[in-house]
């Protein structure tokens, strides 16, 4: 009998769900998404949860076992309440996401479904350590650079959630000028900065296109993001002595050399040899990483 986890990933642009087998593979046909966004409310999130959970569980084979539901969400999260406090969805702060997923899954299956909520960066870190780019590392950090910036730590194969489940939330570290890293380096923040300089595009996708075509403002925005991420990672590497950092998320693919730019900034900024040796690599799991990580919360 194949064992599956229901995986749910909630971010500032979309939420997704899929069934993930105990070997980390997504079940074909089980994956779907619904929009979230800055205007997301308790009601809109609850409706989206029901839609994606029903779609995923409709694909569950009759002879399979569902071991539980794992959720990775934009944070901070409050694991004691099963609630989320997402910076990039202000109207959704306090939404009890864990119960929403449990209720939706239990309604479909006719019985209680064990459900675990985690921070999305921590879930990704667990996935990368299990099946991705940080396998075998003694100490690793995995981050997402997308609508937001999040991260999570793994040491010797064990996810380190911290006291409240929010360890690794790199995007909320304040940088020069009082802004958080997320407010400087995320996709939307980078596009907004470029617009302030006179660029006429609107999105991270526009930045990628225009930079590839030689637009200096678009390129400057990408370099600014990578530099800020690299400098923040230098601080993290100095603090916790990292072997490797894996970077995923849509904006990390804004240019072919984004990871190289981050590595250069980390190496230039780190104060000591042990932190300068930290390697920066691209996520080994692509856009499936957050879902695999959410599943790992109940499979691992």
Each model region followed by its residue ranges:
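Glycine/GP-enriched mid-protein hinge/lid loop-to-helix segment characteristic of carbohydrate kinases
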Residues: 2, 6, 18-22, 29-32, ...
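Conserved phosphate-binding loops in N-terminal lobes of ATP-dependent enzymes
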Residues: 2-73
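Residue-level signal for inorganic ion chemistry
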Residues: 9, 17, 71, 190, ...
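Conserved A3 ("GATE") glycine/threonine-rich loop of ANL adenylate-forming enzymes
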Residues: 13-14, 121-123, 147-150
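Glycine-rich phosphate-binding/hydrolytic loop that grips phosphoryl groups
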Residues: 20, 116-129, 257, 261-300
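Adenine-nucleotide phosphate-binding core of ATP-dependent small-molecule kinases
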Residues: 36-64, 189-246, 251-261, 275-290
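Short secondary-structure boundary segments
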Residues: 73, 145-147, 244, 249-250
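Glycine-rich phosphate-binding loop and adjoining helix at the ATP-binding site
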Residues: 42, 46-50, 65-69, 76-139, ...
């Amino acid at each position: 009998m194949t064992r599956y986890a229901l995986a749910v990933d909630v971010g500032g642009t979309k939420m997704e769900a899929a069934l993930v087998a105990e070997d980390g593979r997504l079940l074909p046909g089980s994956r779907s998404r619904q929009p979230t966004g800055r205007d997301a409310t308790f009601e809109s999130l609850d409706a989206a949860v029901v839609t994606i959970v029903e779609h995923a569980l409709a694909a569950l084979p009759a002879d399979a076992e569902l071991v539980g539901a794992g959720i990775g969400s934009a944070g901070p999260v409050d694991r004691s309440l099963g609630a989320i406090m997402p910076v990039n969805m202000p109207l959704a702060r306090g939404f009890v996401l864990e119960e929403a997923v449990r209720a939706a899954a239990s309604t479909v299956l006719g019985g209680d479904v064990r459900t675990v909520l985690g921070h999305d960066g921590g879930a990704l870190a667990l996935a990368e350590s299990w099946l991705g780019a940080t396998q075998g590392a003694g100490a690793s950090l995995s981050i997402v650079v997308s609508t937001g910036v999040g991260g999570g730590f793994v040491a010797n194969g064990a996810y380190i959630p911290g006291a409240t489940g929010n360890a690794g939330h790199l995007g909320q570290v304040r940088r020069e000028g009082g802004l958080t890293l997320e407010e400087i380096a995320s996709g939307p923040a980078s596009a907004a900065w470029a617009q302030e300089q006179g660029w006429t595009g609107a999105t991270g996708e526009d930045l990628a296109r225009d930079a590839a075509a030689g637009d200096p403002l678009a390129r400057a925005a990408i370099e600014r993001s990578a530099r800020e991420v690299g400098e923040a990672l230098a601080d993290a590497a100095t603090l916790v002595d990292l072997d490797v950092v894996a970077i995923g998320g849509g904006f990390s693919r804004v240019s072919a050399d984004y990871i190289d730019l981050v590595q250069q900034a980390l190496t230039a900024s780190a104060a000591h040899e042990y932190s300068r040796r930290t390697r920066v690599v691209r996520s080994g799991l692509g856009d499936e990483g957050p879902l695999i990580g959410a599943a790992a919360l109940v499979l691992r």
